[in-house]
């Protein structure tokens, strides 16, 4: 005799009203567990984030740089090439000679731990607009900061200032403003931001930067290769003119010597080319450096309806879908 083993659903022996309640209870329990898990995950992720993301009209953005050339009066030409793995971590700083908190935050930056073989490039924007005590800034440098980081800054401080000293930007992506710490210390905040690095893979990038000075005419040529990036990326290169150190004993924060001073900015129209221009001279001395950098932007369209829903909301959405499914199943029974 052939016997068949039947799989019997134990809910069949439960009265229908109780079955419905059990199904609904199941949905409620699952929804609760998913929400708790999502909130814990979100909280853990938020705890690791010690910065404010830079806001852009594009979904993702950052700044990378750079290839450096010393503009020494004893030289007439210089060329340097850099591959992606050699690009330094970039820290842009908004500061002023009267800003005492800037001294504290800069000392913290100087104490950061850097892996062997890696490096940091620091660029200091000095306040210029409505400024009477700081001689280092310029209209171009202040405009650059406000255009690039002003919106993020305004939304990140209670005064809604677009250019607040001290401020730090890591890799053109992550803003730290003032001296308020998110973790146990500013050092941990900055170190976490530094360790994160650029959000795009730069290992295949390369850049060549050249300068010649013939009869006082400065000619620059450059080539930036980012072949690994798709056509959804936009690259906007520029040359920064940086003074290594300026002496200003009248500074209100008592520093006297100020380093990494951004003196001028020259926007470039393409990822390769050449240009001749005059740049702002050093405040004092003969210690200017030209640096090739670029802003990158990624236009990331919405990835459908589900992709546009924040994670906790998507959990609720899925749970409601399950509840509707159960309700329809119950109505058919």
Give residue ranges: language-model regions.
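Secretory targeting signatures
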Residues: 1-55, 89-91, 99, 306-333
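Proline-centered helix-kink/hinge sites
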Residues: 38, 107, 165-166, 312
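Intrinsically disordered, low-complexity boundary segments flanking structured domains
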Residues: 37-38, 108-113, 191-196
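N-terminal "domain-start" segment that seeds a small globular fold
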Residues: 44-81
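Local sequence-structure signature of Cys/Sec-based thiol-disulfide redox active-site neighborhoods
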Residues: 78-128
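Flexible loop/turn segments at secondary-structure boundaries
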Residues: 101, 130-132, 177
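Short, conserved sequence motifs used for protein processing/export or organelle targeting and
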Residues: 134-174, 178-308
């Amino acid at each position: 005799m052939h016997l068949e083993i039947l799989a019997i659903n134990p809910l069949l022996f439960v009265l229908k009203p109780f079955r419905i309640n059990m199904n609904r209870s199941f949905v409620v329990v699952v929804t609760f567990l998913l929400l708790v898990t999502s909130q814990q995950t979100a909280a853990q992720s938020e705890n690791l984030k010690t910065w404010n993301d830079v806001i852009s009209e594009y979904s993702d953005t950052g700044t990378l740089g750079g290839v450096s050339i010393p503009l020494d009066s004893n030289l007439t030409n210089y060329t340097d090439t850099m591959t992606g793995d050699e690009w330094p971590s970039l820290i842009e700083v908004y500061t002023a000679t009267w800003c005492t908190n800037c001294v504290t935050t800069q000392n913290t930056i100087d104490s950061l731990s850097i892996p062997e073989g890696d490096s940091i490039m620091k660029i200091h924007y000095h306040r210029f607009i409505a400024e009477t005590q700081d001689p280092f800034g310029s209209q171009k440098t202040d405009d650059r900061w406000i255009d690039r980081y002003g919106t993020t800054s305004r939304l990140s401080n209670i005064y809604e200032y677009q250019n607040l000293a001290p401020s730090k930007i890591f890799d053109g992506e992550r803003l730290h403003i003032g001296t308020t710490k998110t973790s146990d210390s500013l050092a941990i905040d900055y170190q976490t931001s530094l360790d994160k690095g650029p959000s795009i893979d730069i290992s295949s990038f390369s850049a060549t930067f050249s300068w010649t000075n013939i009869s006082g005419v400065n000619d620059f040529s450059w080539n930036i290769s980012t072949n690994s990036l798709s056509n959804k990326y936009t690259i906007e290169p520029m040359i920064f003119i940086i003074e290594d150190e300026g002496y200003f004993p009248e500074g209100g924060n008592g520093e006297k010597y100020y380093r990494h001073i951004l003196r001028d900015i020259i926007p470039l129209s393409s990822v390769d080319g050449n240009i001749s221009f005059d740049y702002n001279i050093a405040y004092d001395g003969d210690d200017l450096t030209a640096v090739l950098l670029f802003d990158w932007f990624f236009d990331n369209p919405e990835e459908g309806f589900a992709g546009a829903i924040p994670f906790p909301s998507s959990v609720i959405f899925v749970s409601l879908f399950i509840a509707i499914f159960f309700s329809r199943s119950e109505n058919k029974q």
